[in-house]
């Protein structure tokens, strides 16, 4: 039994006494307690050690007071489970090898047994669930097919996604074959996370804004919808959040996937998003992460604007306060604590 279920109730657009808050990348480098653990181990080992992943997952709940925990992991564990070599190199970035650029490469990728290849994530979820003891809900997550596709084809991060788009435009059938294969794994991965104890799941499409509206509808949304529908079919009471970064012009299309909530980037007025969506889904967001570099007064002022612009809640509205992207690693934890405390206090007047 959850002692604090505000996050889940907000995702289901049920009445809540205040706006719940958590932030993307809340378990991370801005926390000295996290850095102390990272000094002793590398990033992927941390992801793959359930005891350590559990500890860092719970840190922001204990230290900051957020209303939900999100399991500590990385979106690229899916690529690794499918047979790619994933390296996260300090100060150099991410490298995946070999890059997937031909039919032979696609055929070489496996559809893994999730429990075998990603069992450490399930162990971390179960362990975290036990340690949380119902204090707050636990979120599972995956990258979206398009974002994982770009990493696979580019062999890492990219500025212009040239190899990924070359496959899209020259070999669209091949691109869809790879996207479909990745999507199958994502869907099974999300289902297994729920089975292991996740109370909600989020799909991160971090590179969504690299695509035009038409291309996003063709190469990204169908696979998000596939995963959302699979989750809602098997676990109808488990909320699904879709975060398609900076896709502000196709909000209705994203809502049409059947998701319960939608992450909103900071470059759109939340009042406009709510007006367009007409409370069909919960809106999650949407403060600029760099606001947390500001003074406490500035942080409160900017958070207050978002609460005010979302406005008074109706019987079927939902808002989860979050950043428009992940918290930056050099933010002062006290600034995030200021934000969380302010939202908890100030949001009551809108409910």
UniProtKB/Swiss-Prot annotation:
Catalytic activity: uroporphyrinogen III + 4 H(+) = coproporphyrinogen III + 4 CO2
Gene3D superfamilies (alphabetical): 3.20.20.210
Subcellular location: Cytoplasm
GO biological process: protoporphyrinogen IX biosynthetic process
Binding of substrate, residues: 25-29, 74, 151, 206, 325
Disulfide bonds: none
The enzyme's E.C. designation: 4.1.1.37
NCBIfam families recorded: hemE
Family: Belongs to the uroporphyrinogen decarboxylase family.
Name this protein carries in UniProt: Uroporphyrinogen decarboxylase
Organism expressing this protein natively: Chlorobium phaeobacteroides (strain BS1)
Top-level taxonomy: Bacteria, Pseudomonadati, Chlorobiota, Chlorobiia, Chlorobiales
């Amino acid at each position: 039994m959850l002692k604090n279920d505000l996050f889940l109730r907000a995702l289901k657009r049920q009445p809540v006494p205040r706006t719940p808050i958590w932030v993307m990348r809340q378990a991370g480098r801005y926390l000295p307690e996290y850095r102390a653990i990272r000094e002793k181990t590398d990033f992927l080992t941390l992801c793959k050690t359930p005891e350590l992943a559990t500890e860092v997952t719970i840190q922001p709940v204990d230290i900051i007071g957020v209303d939900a925990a999100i399991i500590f992991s990385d979106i690229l564990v899916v690529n690794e489970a499918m047979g790619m070599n994933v390296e996260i190199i300090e100060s150099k970035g991410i490298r995946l090898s070999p890059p997937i650029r031909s039919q032979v490469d696609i055929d070489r990728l496996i559809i893994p047994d999730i429990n075998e290849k990603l069992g450490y994530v399930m162990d971390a979820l179960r362990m975290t669930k036990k340690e949380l003891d119902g204090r707050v809900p636990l979120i599972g997550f995956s990258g979206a097919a398009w974002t994982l596709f770009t990493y696979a084809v580019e062999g890492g991060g990219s500025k212009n996604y040239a190899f990924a788009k070359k496959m899209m435009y020259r070999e669209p059938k091949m691109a869809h074959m790879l996207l479909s294969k990745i999507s199958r794994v994502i869907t099974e991965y999300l289902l297994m996370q729920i089975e292991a104890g996740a109370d909600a799941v989020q799909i991160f499409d971090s590179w969504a804004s690299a695509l035009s509206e038409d291309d996003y509808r063709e190469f990204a949304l169908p696979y998000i919808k596939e995963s959302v529908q699979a989750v809602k079919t098997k676990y109808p009471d488990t909320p699904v959040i879709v975060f398609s970064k900076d896709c502000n012009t196709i909000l209705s299309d994203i809502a049409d996937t059947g998701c319960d909530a939608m992450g909103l980037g900071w470059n759109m007025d939340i009042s406009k998003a709510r007006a367009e969506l007409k409370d069909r889904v919960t809106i999650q967001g949407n403060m600029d992460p760099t606001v947390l570099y500001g003074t406490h007064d500035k942080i409160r002022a900017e958070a207050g604007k978002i609460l005010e612009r979302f406005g008074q809640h109706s019987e079927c509205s939902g808002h989860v306060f979050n950043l428009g992207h992940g918290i930056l690693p050099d933010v002062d934890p006290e600034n995030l604590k200021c934000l969380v405390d302010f939202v908890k206090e100030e949001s009551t007047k809108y409910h």
